[in-house]
Amino acid sequence: SFTPDEVCTLTIEFYRRNYIEGLFLSSGILHSPNYTMQLIYETLYKLRTEFHFQRYIHVKAIPGADQELIQRTGFLADRMSVNLELPTAEGLKKLAPHKNRKNILAPMRLVQSKMAENQNEVAVYRNAPRFVPAGQSTQMIIGATPETDFQIINVAESLYKKFELKRVFYSAFIHVNEDEHLPARTGDGPPLLREHRLYQADWLLRYYGFEAKELLSEKNPNFNVLVDPKCNWALEHLECFPVEVNRADYHMLLRVPGIGYKSAGRIVKARRMGTLDFTDLKKMGVV
C-alpha cells in the first residue's frame, strides 16, 4: 500500500504531466476502519494544504469509521462514495458475511445529513467551507448474486430518493477465483451488455421521469439485452403512440424513443412560435 506522501507525490507528478485531471482515492481496510480513514484524511489534507492541489477529488468513505473522521475528510473532497457492494442484504450476507448492510448505509446517511446542513451554512455564510459539493455516489456489483434487473433498479431508485445520491454505478461481475457461492464460470465473460442496459435504465430514472415499476415488473423482471429500456417501454405501451409533437407535454415527449431531454426542450420552445412539421423536427436534429 502507498503512504499518504507517496500518493500525494504521484498525484502531483501525474497532474503536472497532464496524465490526470483529478484523483479517485479508495482503499481496502488496513488494520481498522479508523486507521484507514485517517490515512485517507491525511492524504487529502496534504494534497490540499501542502501541495495546493485544488482539482477534483473523489474519495471513499470507509464503513465503520468514526463519523468525525468522515466529516473532516468530506470538507476536503469534491465527491464521496460508499460502495453498496451488492444489490441486496441477502447477497451481501452470502458473499461477504463479514460486512454489514447497516454499516454501509450509516456513512451514506451521515454524508446526506451533513450535505444538507452544509447547504444551510453556505446559504448564510458565502465563504463557509463546502462539504462534498459534487455529492455522493455508490457502486453495485452485477451478476455475482441472483438479483433480477427489477430488484436492482428498485434498489437504485430507493437510494436516489432516500439518500439523494448523484450516481449509482454498476459493475459487471468478473470471475477472478472459484467459489461455491459464485455463479458458474461460462464462456460468455462479464455481463457487460446487461450492465449497459442498467446504466440506460438508471438514466431514465434520473432524467426522464420514469419509475422502476414502469420499466420492469415481477412478471417481466429483466431487461431485453437486444433493445434499450426506453424503446422496450414504448413497444409495451403502443397505446401511447403515435405522439402528436405539437400537443404532447414535455414529459410525454421524453418517453418517445429518439427524443432526449434537449430535443424535448427544443420542441416545446419552438412550437410556441407555430405548428411544427417534419422539416422543423429535422432542423432541430430530432429526426
Question: Where in this protein do the model-derived segments appear?
Answer:
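Long, highly charged, low-complexity intrinsically disordered interaction regions
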Residues: 181-255
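Alpha-helical interaction/regulatory segments in DNA maintenance proteins
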Residues: 282-287
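Flexible, glycine/charged-enriched surface loops at secondary-structure junctions
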Residues: 120-128, 170, 211-217
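Conserved Radical SAM active-site core
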Residues: 1-138, 142-146, 159, 177, ...
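Radical SAM enzyme [4Fe-4S]-AdoMet core and its adjacent flexible, acidic
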Residues: 93-101, 161-207, 267
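Residue-level signature of tetratricopeptide-repeat
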Residues: 270-271
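Long C-terminal interaction/binding lobes of large macromolecular proteins
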Residues: 132, 139, 150-163, 191-194
